[in-house]
Every structure is written in structure tokens, then in C-alpha cells.
Amino acid sequence: MPSKNPADTVSIYVPGASINSQTASDSTQPAASAYHHKANHNQNRSIEQSAQQAAEQSLHTAETVAPKVGFVSLGCPKALVDSERIITELTRDGYRVASDYNGADLVVVNTCGFIESAVQESLDAIGEALNKNGKVIVTGCLGKDAQKIRDMHPAVLAVTGAHAYDEVITAVSTHAPMPQAIQDKKAYDPKIDLIDLAGVKLTPSHYAYLKISEGCNHRCTFCIIPSLRGDLLSRPIEQVMGEAMALKKAGVKEILVISQDTSAYGVDLKYKTSFWDGMPLKSKFFDMCQALAKVGIWVRLHYVYPYPHVDKVVELMAKPGDRGGLLPYLDIPLQHASPSVLKAMKRPAHSENTLARIQKWREINPDIVIRSTFVVGFPGETEEDFEYLLEWLKQAKLDRVGCFTYSEIEGAVANDLPNPVPEAIKQERYERFMAVQQQISEQKLQEKVGKTMTVLVDEIDTEEQIAICRSYADAPEIDGHVYVDNIVQNGMMMVKVGDMLTVTIDEASEYDLFASYDAVQALA
């Protein structure tokens, strides 16, 4: 049995850093980590592996003289999906793609610009790529401020904004053109579907992100996403379902639905009706969830605002032990609870009724797990506001919570709000907030001891002989784990990555569960 406070050892691609890094549960991560992480988590397939796997399906990618593109991906899961899309197109065009600079003809850096620490990390990554390679194309959220990038790094070849896939491909083909010898061997359009509809994935083969929309219609004062990614732009429902089915066909066991505002899906399309599998289907949040629930694999919803119509979606959710369906899990970006702070943030309507809404969801589905992220130290936040938030947290008893201290973001309206909170007070409130949540989390996890749960295997630690898993209550990278022992019997490893197991919970810590697996019973 591992320690009750295990570190999650991860291997990530960090420009200029060692390949190994340590991160803890989200209570102890830096405040910004709730919104910013580097791509290439240790569970993830490397960019080389993913691109090579896809390239093996293409005749012309066997040419070793094809240009090599180094790729650095920074930011949130939505940015990771953008990276997957670009790498898919590059691979279809015959390029070799790798997650380093060695021997690359140029480097693409997909940046993050959400918070200042992310901006600085992106600028540092661009600088390192220029130093080590010299030919760099910049894309992603920070690309919106092209002048800032060019002022610091005038040698970059091209700068594009977020989800500017065609512009990136054009820039790559301009600065690293495909040799004519390879072009001459193309007897077909390189964009034809030589790669599965799901495309190249940088996540492990057993789970994948499914982005259903881009942009956001809200104008929260602390956020610059609309200026980086535009207003809400939903994918037609037939595209969403087509990718979901392709992911299932590829062996994916879990789909994580992401966007900036998942519950607003289809508003911009005016809930247009299309046809899927011979039946009419609306581009609408409820209809999409209803269809995804029938795909037959785990479906996890992220970035769901607490609108009243979410109640109907909760009614669709599966039971915790089910191995397919809409998981009883909601990731809700609440940000705060104090009415005055929510008003200053200009959060969407219905944010003030969240306690009642959460109670109703639990009445509909007692097994539902709710995760959220909060900001403390927002300009104008008083001690009274913070105490209100703490009391709200104690009543809400959320299952999974992340928190970060407010920091200014260039271009955000909140920068000009009066009464900024001193840094020392921000940090003190952060620690008090997480201390309360830690107690709530530990209490809720202790209630799981003695019960059986269905878990998905993310990793195998062969030295410790444990499987690092997740239950329906755990999203990858941001939530806890279920550590499972008894996976080796009679000298044989009984489980593998991507397996779903039924385990018995033996112990619990503040954020993780520890379980045992009975392979004999499972095979009976």
C-alpha cells in the first residue's frame, strides 16, 4: 500500500527543465494550476508516438526526407485539442512531428495567455526554441498579442492566434516546404482521411478530450478569453457525434467534453436540427448529452455553468458502477459565492442560486460529484465576502475543489477595479480556503471506505506493483487517484492501462483512495 500522501510523479515536456517533475493534489499545486498546465502529462503519448502512429497509415510519410517539425504545447485541455488538430493536419501533409528541437526544420510553439505566469512561460518557451533551433512559428492564445511577441522575439517566423489551424499549416509549408520528390509521389489530396476522424491524440489511448465549441459570450471582468478566442462558436452536432464515435472505435474508454461554456452549446447555431444515425438531432446541450450518453463509454462534462436547464441533464446521468454513459460528475466554474464579488466579476445569471441548484442535483442523483474552481483576493473582496465564501463552501460540501489567488491579466477589466487585495492577504485566504476544503474532501472520501467502485487504469507502477486509477469522481490531471494493489497474482500482472476494474476501497486520504483488486473474483 503506498503512502497516504503519495506524490504524483509526472513526466512532462518543459522547455529548459528536467524531464521529471513532481506535482501534488490540486490543494497543494500553485494557485494558477487550476487553469494552466503543460501538455504532455506523463500518461500522455509523446508527440512523436502519436504522429508516427498516424503517419503509419499514410503512404508518403515513410519518406525520411520529409521535413521535421518540433512541437511545444502549453496551456489548458482546450489548447491541447488545438495542438492535436494542428499535428493531425501536419501529419496528413507528410510532416514528421516531434516534441523536441533536435534536428527539427522549425518549431511550432502553441502558447497560453490566460494569466501572467502563463504568458511568461510562453515567452520563455519561444525564446528557448529560438536559441536551440532558430526557426519558430508561434500560435495559440498569446498569439493574439503578436506585437508583444515580436517586441521580445523579433526573429519569430510567424505569429497566429488561437485555433488558427490553416494559418499555422500555411506558415509551416512556407518556411519548411515539402520536397518536390515527395510532392510528386502524392497521387491524392493530402487532406483526405488517411488518419482516423478522431485525428492524432496527445492523451493516452484510453481517454480523449472532445471540444464541442470555441469562444465565449460572457464578459467576466477577470477573463480575456473572448478577446483571445472570440464569441461562442459551436460545432454542428453531427461533427461532435462523428468524433465521439470515432474515438470509441479507436478504443477510447472515456471522453472529456470541453469548451469555454459547455451548457451554452448550440446557442449560436439557434439549436439547428441535423441528422445523426438517421434520426433528427438538435445542436443543443441536452440533446448532445442524451446522444453522447448512448455512445457506450464514459462521458465526463467540464465547464458547465449552473443554468436551470442543467437539471434535465443530471437526470440522464449513469450510475457510478456503469462502464458507459454520462458520468455523474459536473465541473462547474463557480469562481466565488459572495453576491458582491460575483457582481464585480460580472458572472452570468443564476450564479447566486448555486446552493439551491446543487441541492436539487443531489436530490436527482445522490451520487453526483461536483468539482469547481474559485478565486480569492479578487479586487474589492472584503473579509466579510471571504467569510461568506467559506460558509458557502462548508454548506455546499463540494467533492473536488481548486483555488487560485487573483492576479492581474493584461487586458482584463478587473485590473482597473478599486480596492485591490494585498498579496499577503490573498495567500492567507487561499490557505484558509484550502484547509476547509481539505477537511471536506477527506470526510467525503472516508465515506467510500468499504465500498466497491469501478475504476479506469491510467498507469501501472511495476516497482510498487500498484495500478494508478481514476473513478467516475476523478478527472485526469486535476482530481485525485485510486491506488489499487493486488494486481500481481502468481507472478502475473493481471491488469493493463485502459482496463476497467471493480475494486474495494480500503483506505482514504485527503484527496486519494486506496483499494484492492480481486482478480480471481473478477474472472469468475
Curated annotation (Swiss-Prot):
Cofactor(s) this protein requires: [4Fe-4S] cluster
Binding site for [4Fe-4S] cluster 2: 216, 220, 223
Composition bias, Polar residues: 20-31
A GO biological process held by the record: tRNA modification
InterPro entries documented for this protein: Elp3/MiaA/NifB-like_rSAM, Methylthiotransferase, Methylthiotransferase_CS, Methylthiotransferase_N, Methylthiotransferase_N_sf, NA-bd_OB-fold, Ribosomal_uS12_MeSTrfase_RimO, rSAM
Residue ranges, annotated region (Disordered): 20-59
Reaction(s) catalysed (UniProt annotation): L-aspartate(89)-[ribosomal protein uS12]-hydrogen + (sulfur carrier)-SH + AH2 + 2 S-adenosyl-L-methionine = 3-methylsulfanyl-L-aspartate(89)-[ribosomal protein uS12]-hydrogen + (sulfur carrier)-H + 5'-deoxyadenosine + L-methionine + A + S-adenosyl-L-homocysteine + 2 H(+)
Localization, UniProt: Cytoplasm
Enzyme Commission designation: 2.8.4.4
Highest taxon of the lineage: Bacteria
Cofactor binding notes: Binds 2 [4Fe-4S] clusters. One cluster is coordinated with 3 cysteines and an exchangeable S-adenosyl-L-methionine.
Keywords: 4Fe-4S, Cytoplasm, Iron, Iron-sulfur, Metal-binding, S-adenosyl-L-methionine, Transferase
CDD domains for this protein: Radical_SAM (cd01335)
Top EC group: transferase
Chain ranges of the Radical SAM core domain: 202-443
Family under the similarity heading: Belongs to the methylthiotransferase family. RimO subfamily.
Functional note: Catalyzes the methylthiolation of an aspartic acid residue of ribosomal protein uS12.
Protein name (Swiss-Prot/TrEMBL): Ribosomal protein uS12 methylthiotransferase RimO
Lineage: Bacteria, Pseudomonadati, Pseudomonadota, Gammaproteobacteria, Moraxellales
